[in-house]
């Protein structure tokens, strides 16, 4: 069952078109990465999913209903948009208790989510004394109070140290393994490559990709082949003549694009060129993202 359904979603502020006819779905049992350059419309889309902003056109449903029609929203969807949105003088326990009581949730859930996020030992400490990583955990604990099947996180690893990033990555994967739908935005491509099962990429408010990570990297190309040979100059000539693009790599190697590893190997055999290395270099998620969104950034540098 689809848990988040976005159809033809459009948001306009005056003459500024922030989200433009956007459609995608988020499925249970997986982490869906929500990616795009700054100003792409990610945060605005999340706000519309959560009923914090009204669409100009289109629709978005959560579990088959609009957010405002959910009788007890926290039991359907939990969201963390700003981990700093907590009273600094209030303890972690009292912060969560206030949320539970005001939403008609059992008090026992406070202790359960504190334990699950590793905050039970500091439950009596004022949130204002928490580190950034602990505040993120407190925000995640709040999203779990209603035991929802849908979870939304906006840039949850921003500013965290490697230990904090790894904890959140593993926790996202754990939540998805329980059959929950997890939608997470991030600008850290290396992190998304390790966390997400599926990607939704937008640029200037429009959908650019709705696919798996491997499929995205394959579709955008950018793969190269690293070659080492005792006679790089001569082989570079043959590679160029065959339609390849050749540039010098490290320590006398050649980096070739436009030809596959199989084609390069056959070319070397035909011309009697012995190769000491032939290694396909797969494009990274960051490479694929940059290629896909290169025409959708708000500003671009100009080479001198």
In which residue ranges do the predicted regions lie?
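Conserved NTP-handling cores and scaffolds of large molecular machines
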Residues: 103, 220, 243, 282, ...
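Solvent-exposed beta-strand sheet faces enriched in polar/charged residues
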Residues: 7, 63, 228, 279-281
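ABC transporter nucleotide-binding domain
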Residues: 168-259
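ABC transporter nucleotide-binding domains
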Residues: 2-6, 11-203, 209
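Residues that scaffold the ATP/ADP-binding catalytic core of kinase and kinase-like folds
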Residues: 70, 216, 288, 292
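C-terminal coupling/interaction segments
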Residues: 257-304
């Amino acid at each position: 069952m689809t848990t988040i359904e976005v159809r033809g979603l459009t948001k306009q502020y005056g003459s500024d078109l922030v989200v433009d006819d956007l459609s995608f779905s988020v499925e249970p049992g997986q982490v869906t990465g929500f990616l795009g350059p700054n100003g792409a419309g990610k945060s605005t889309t999340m706000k519309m999913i959560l009923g914090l902003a009204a669409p100009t056109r289109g629709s978005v449903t959560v579990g088959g209903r609009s957010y405002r029609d959910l009788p007890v929203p926290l039991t359907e969807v939990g969201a963390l948009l700003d981990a700093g949105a907590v009273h600094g003088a209030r303890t972690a326990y009292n912060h969560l208790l206030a949320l539970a009581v005001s939403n008609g949730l059992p008090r026992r859930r406070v202790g359960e989510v504190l334990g699950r996020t590793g905050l039970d030992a500091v439950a009596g400490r004022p949130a204002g004394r928490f580190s950034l990583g602990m505040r993120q955990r407190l925000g995640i604990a709040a999203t779990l109070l209603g035991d929802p099947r849908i979870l939304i996180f906006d840039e949850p690893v921003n500013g965290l140290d490697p230990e904090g990033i790894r904890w959140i990555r593993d926790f996202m994967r754990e939540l998805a393994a329980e059959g929950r739908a997890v939608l997470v935005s991030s600008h850290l491509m290396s992190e998304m490559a390790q966390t997400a099962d599926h990607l939704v990429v937008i640029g200037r408010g429009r959908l650019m990709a709705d696919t798996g990570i491997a499929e995205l990297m394959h579709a955008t190309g950018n793969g190269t082949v690293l070659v080492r040979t005792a006679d790089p100059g001569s082989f570079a000539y043959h590679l160029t003549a065959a339609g390849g693009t050749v540039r010098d790599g490290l320590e006398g190697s050649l980096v070739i694009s436009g030809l596959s590893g199989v084609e390069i190997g056959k070319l070397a055999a035909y011309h009697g060129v012995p190769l000491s290395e032939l290694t396909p270099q797969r494009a990274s998620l960051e490479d694929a993202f940059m290629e896909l969104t290169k025409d959708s950034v708000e500003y671009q540098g100009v080479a001198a």
